[in-house]
Amino acid sequence: MAVDTETTTTTIPVTDSDRIDDQNNLTSNAIPHASEKTVPDSPASEQNEVSDESEDKPSKTKKSFGFYAIIVALALTSLLTSLEATITSTALPTITSELGGASLYVWVVNGYYLTQTAFQPFVGQMADIYGRRWPMICSAAMFTIGSGVAGGSKNIQTLIAGRLLQGIGSGGILVLTEIIICDLLPLRERGKYLGMIVSLVGIGAALGPLFGGLIVQYSSWPWVFYLNVPIGGVACLMLFFFLRVRSDKTPNYMQRLRRFDWIGNVLFVMSMVSILIALSWAGTEYPWSSFRVVVPLVLGFVGSAAFVVYEGSSFCVNPTMPLHIFSNRTSGTAFAVTFLHTLSSVSVMYFLPVYFQAVLNASPSRSGVQLLPTILFMIPGAIAGGTLLSKFGRYRPLQHGGLAFMIIGFGLLTLLDADSNTGEWVGYQLLGALGTGLALPVLLPAVQAPLTEEDTALCTATWSFMRTYGFIWGATIATAVFNNRFDVLAPRITDTTIGSQLTNGRAYELATKVFMNSIKDPVTQREVKSVYVDALNVVWYVSLAFAGLGFLLVFLEKEITLRKELDTKYAMEEKKKKPENSEA
């Protein structure tokens, strides 16, 4: 609800539903409540500033057994989705050797990310219309069913279909986990639990390649996917029995369907699919200049522009991604910082294994172990960030601190070379990992602080999308600059045969211990490692630059008081509530 700062009347909201933004610039459709009080000739409200002494006291919400059961179920599903995102990286060669379809293998990985990304805003709107309970249960069930389909596949096409189902389910899980945590806890307390979930996601992503390698080595590849079925089944049952939350129900089924932004969702999904197809082909299947890359990329960006125009038009009654969540300075900046934070951190995590395998001659499994310092220090960083946010209620210092650590850590990576010892490559990872974890759980609260609780589902879905989108572009940009720099430096390799093998986008693919050991001449091997080191330095510098840009953008955010009271119509059902007030 906007407040006219030119008048002498001050509006004091009684509930957090009427949250006004910083600088009173939020022009949303919030409806005034009857409980609002108007105090004439009072001093300007200071509700957006962290000035009250009581604001430093951490909030405490009474938590039932059902609350913790829900958190456990959300943690299990989040762990599985992150594990499944990386587990195929080491298992894929074995899978394709048995199923065939080598020309389609890339979609076993990319299909998962494609549907995971494209359907996130749609799931956010579904949560607004149907409540949180059934969309979450259905997302977890779809992920579990997709895992069963993938595990039981007899050909590559069925495997890809299973991965597409897994992706849709995982996208829903990512969005709804964060939405449900926001429904269960006031804004001041959310960071702590978001930090816990982020930690589990980091553990899953780290263990994925290791689990994939162990499964194909000591068991059979279907268990790469089957392992999700029993655990996912347990999580579904826990959600069914304990995720009892209130729902804003519309009795008429057709009225609910009409509330969906069908045109906007179709435009968004088609645009994202087009962009992601182009990015999956660029630099690997086809050069960036190929029409097979350029055409879908252009169509995707044009479709994205059309989506934005439509969402802001009068024709869109119930937008999937309302533009007012971006027009606010603090939330809009926090979205951008989230994208840059993810892009820079993913670029580093994506290419550290290249350094370990191509430069230090590590095996894939050994490389996974060498990456553990990043994951292990990201986890306490995330927990610390969430805990400090709950205690002090200030997100800007934590964002600045996290991004500063990332800048220093990524800068130190430029010192790595073929002669670096264990202490160096472990130590240099620690600062970047700590900073990545510290900033992550305090980004979503910064988005939500100036917005109303009615915006929770849609702004959370948008934030989750920005994070996933940053992941995709982080890998894409890092790969592009790495390949380009490697091609420029390749003439330094005196053996032209080896040099030609590594150019035109193949340096990343051949960054393995097996390939490096196939180079028998020690001088040539040293030259190749030197080119890898210098090409990787460009990746570290680019990651540093994006983190630096994020650091500067944080100055645009305002430090807004984080709400200590829970004001949502989707809170947990109380035992004495009538059945019609809860989701069936």
From Swiss-Prot:
Q: Which Gene Ontology terms of cellular component type are present? A: plasma membrane
Q: Where is the composition biased (Low complexity)?
A: 1-11
Entries under Pfam families matching the protein: MFS_1
**Where found, per UniProt?**
Membrane
Q: Where is this region: Disordered?
A: 1-60
Topology with respect to the bilayer: Multi-pass membrane protein
Glycosylation positions?
A: 25, 328
What keywords are annotated for this sequence in UniProt? Glycoprotein, Membrane, Transmembrane, Transmembrane helix, Transport, Virulence
For molecular function, the Gene Ontology terms on record are: transmembrane transporter activity
Transmembrane domains' residue ranges: 65-85, 99-119, 134-154, 167-187, 196-216, 223-243, 262-282, 293-313, 334-354, 369-389, 398-418, 425-445, 462-482, 536-556
Q: Which CDD domains match?
A: MFS_Azr1_MDR_like (cd17502)
Q: What is its main location?
A: membrane
PROSITE patterns under this entry? MFS, SUGAR_TRANSPORT_1
Q: Which family does it belong to?
A: Belongs to the major facilitator superfamily.
According to its UniProt entry, what is the function of this protein? MFS-type transporter; part of the gene cluster that mediates the biosynthesis of GKK1032, fungal natural products containing a macrocyclic para-cyclophane connected to a decahydrofluorene ring system that show potent antitumor activities.
Put simply, this protein is called MFS-type transporter gkaD
